[in-house]
Amino acid sequence: MSQTARSAPVRAGGEFFAAPAEAAHRRYEALRAYLYEGLSAAEAAQRFGYTTASLLSAARDFRAGRRDFFVQPRPGPKSAPAKQAARAKVIELRRAGHSIYEIAEDLARSDTPLNRTGVAEICAEEGFGRLWTRPAAERGGPRRETLPRADVADFATLPAQAETRVAGLLLAIPDLLQLDLPALVHAAGYPSTAKIPATSYLLSLLALKLVGIRRVSHVEDLAADPGAALFAGLAALPKTTALTTYSYRLEHRKQLHFLAALDKATLAAGLATGDEINLDFHAVMHWGQDPALEKHYVPRRSQRTRSVLTFFAEDADTHTLLYANADLAKATQAGEVLAFADHWNTTTGRYPGLLIFDSKVTTQAQLAELDDRGIRFLTLRARSPKLTASLHALPAKAWTALTVARAGGKTRRVQVHEDSAARLTAYPRTVRQLAVTGLGHDEPTILITNDHDRTTKALIETYAQRMNIEQRLAEAIRSFSLDALAGAVPLNVDLDVVLSVLAHTVCAALRRRLPGYATATPDTLQRRFLHTGGHIINHSNHITVRLDRRAYSPVLRQADLPTITVPWWGHRQLHYEFA
């Protein structure tokens, strides 16, 4: 609404009051005209560009005391006691050539502490200029402690006793030996360096996963800890550059060989059955703008954004992760189900008994290829308007009532319509189709499968358990920082997701040794056991790990933790004690 100014001002400068520019000033003049000068609400509102209702609302707020037009200034303190107390010392140190950082550090140890901002203000007030950058030797002490170099552990020079924050990390060694980690590394063909064996490299990276270090670049949190180094058979862990560049020496084929050997060991240890396997994709978001990365749908952001697409497989019976791949692209992602089936056939000599996955994982053409190979699948069918309408048109007698099991020992009553010869658009044969209502959705859930032997109830309950793989991925994010992208190069992420599978398998094996923890999640194991501190006692020919007393120490005393021989310790024995 246009603003109508009052008559021309009597004196110069009066236009400031006739045509106020600021919102608060305009509101003040409008209220003054209405409340003091006696203009009607309509006249005052028109003069200053308000609607009548807006002006009356402003008047109501003013009368209620909710409008302050003139704020009294509140001057701040005229002196800075802390600066004044430290001024003489700051001037003395600055004249001696010390930097602002060094002066602040020195004052922090005195009775007149002052932060860097205060020191900088004093230097500016006293006319001191900026110091040129000086050689490190002239700038005072080092900012960070020099960490020990990574090398193979020399047990002859190790101290007789050392304190560690992660003594609990060594609880994972018996299960790593049961899986025969050195043989897995050899099967993968992972390279060694002049100083560090391949097994120690992998154990160094695994240690970060098991204790919940979010990124490889945070390795310095553990780099000087003797427990973490001993876990890997080293005098000290490799540092950031060595660990982050190790993946550049690898290729996807090596990860496949490692997973094949790991899956064999997992099956032999009874950690998986391989009969029914859940499959799913997971996009790991990239926070930069790398144009080389494709855009994928990221559930956490509810949008498509640049990310690295990963693929996981989980044993449906034991919930152990079996497979991971980050070497994917949009053009090839639909074929990943077949790639996993071939991997499993190569590893075990047979195809999986049943593959369970979401409708977005693959295409109908790939489903036909699975059927050609005799691989059974169970997946969702997308609901089209035509299909939904046809289901709504079915008579009540076409639906069969069933009671299906739910998590936690509960049950649910559902209605099912089964079509044993349903047709798909791009699938050359018929499939068995189950339309299910009563699962908490507005529209029927439609399952399709080429399995004509399992009962309807068994198929519905089996697909309901597919959500377990999403729980495993949530555990990997929470415990192993799966969503902390290892880099913009998928090759880096490929090794990282394989390490997450290995860490998950180790935790699955460890919890079997702990009474009452058969279903514990990895983050629970980390918090209660793997993060336990303690002491490492070197007896020359064997090592004793004495774990500190904690609330959960009784569980460890009852656990199956045998004395074992560790190959990467020069075949020395490992023995556990509890304080």
Q: Predicted regions span which residues?
A:
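Short amphipathic alpha-helical "interface-anchor" segments enriched in bulky aromatics
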Residues: 219, 455-490, 495, 499, ...
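Short, Lys/Arg-enriched anionic-surface-contact patches
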Residues: 3-27, 72-85, 190-197
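A short, amphipathic alpha-helix used for macromolecular contacts
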Residues: 80-113
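Short, basic alpha-helical/linker "hinge" immediately adjacent to a nucleic-acid-recognition surface
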Residues: 41-42, 46-47, 51-92, 117, ...
